[in-house]
Structure formats: C-alpha cells, structure tokens
Amino acid sequence: EWAGAATRVAKNLGVAQRPDVKAIVDDAVAETAVLRNRVIGRATVDLARDNPDRLRESDLGNFVADAMRRKYAGVGVQAAITNSGGLRADILQSSTPGGEAPGEITWGEAFAVLPFGNATVIETLTYEQLVAALANGFRPPCGDVSGGTGRTPQYSGLWVEFHCDGNVPVIDNVWLAEPGPKPTTPPLGPGDTVRIVTNDFMFAGGDGYTALSGGTNVLQTGDLLLDVMIEEIERLGEITTLPPRD
C-alpha cells in the first residue's frame, strides 16, 4: 500500500517541449474553437462574482441561481442553491477572448464560469435540512473560513435572515419569497418542506453541504449546470439589467 504524498513541482521543470505533443494540443484547440467562440448572447452589464472574498451574494451567482430555479419551476421547484466556489470566472462586457465584439457572450466564456461538468439535482428538503444547509453556507461570512469560502451560498427563491454568534451562523428566519423588502408573510418553520434544485457536488456533501444529501424524492436531471446557464442567456438574448438582490 502506497503511503506517500503528492508533491507540487514546477509545471515545466526544465523539460523540453515535444513538438508531436504540442501538435496534438494545437489541433484540439483549433477543433474546439468553433464551439468556444460561438456567440450565445449579449450583455450590457457585467455579471461578476464576489471574488476573491466569496463572502456574499453576487450578480453572477444570482443569475445562475435564478436560471436554475426558472428552468425547473414547471416541475415544482421553489428555490435554488449553488456554491460560490463553483463560479470560476466573470462575464464582463470588455472581455473578448475569441475576438468577438465587446458585450457578446461566447460559449467559451460560459464554460469558463462553470467548467466542472456539474449536473443539477432536484430534491425535497425538510425545514431543518434547509436551515442546516444555509448555516453551513454562511460559515465564511461569519468568519469561519476553515473549510474555504467556496461554500458561501448563491440562492434564488429564498429570503433569509441570519446572525453570527461568534463564528457560528444562526438562521433566524427563512421565507420562500422573491427579492425585495422583508416578507410580511409567516416564515417557514418545522413541518414545512421545500423543493429545491442544487448541483450534484453539493448534493454529494461537497463544501460541507451534508444536509443536502438527505433530501427525498430525488431527481437526477442529467442536465449540466453549464447548459442551464447557457439556455437562460439564449432565452434572454441580451442581458440589460442585473438580477435583483435577495
């Protein structure tokens, strides 16, 4: 049984470049250029992350979470939650990696945002499971970054009140609600359930979201989160306003 450990090394370490290997890479880059440079929409606003802090909701996070909820609203989904760490790039008007016009969004730019191949998962959570998931997500904003800041949640369809007891998040109230003023309806409580959509990394307990592994009526959609975002960009055609803040 191997008892060693991984060792970081310089990526070239003085090794000469092999022309035959470089040719394979160059061919692959050329073959995928058509897909990467395909324009899927336009934006007159920047969709940016809260980067590098990842301690609060972001315009890009709201866009992705809203797209998730909208995609599955017709099958009973009430809320969406994804993790900040899954968002790997911004969508900026000034970015033109494929030579496209400023403001145009390419498939490659969308892929840079969500490159991990995660799929969406729908499940029903109890109130207690939802609260536990949110408490895990709000650990970084409360100062507990021991597990990294990527767990900070980006969500849609929820209005959440919480406070920090030292470094421990305490969820005070959760509503099913659209962004805007504090809801005046009663918040969720014991006995309530919520149908949510998340990603398969979080569903498997990634970023500490073990509470999401215990949902019921689970539906593995098979839809890539990347495709859900692209579908929303194509549906809008042009993004002219930022998503409302929850």
Regions found by a protein language model. Give the residues of each.
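Binuclear metal-dependent phosphoesterase catalytic core
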Residues: 1-42, 159-166
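Glycine-rich phosphate/diphosphate-binding loops and the adjacent beta-loop-alpha structural elements
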Residues: 36-57
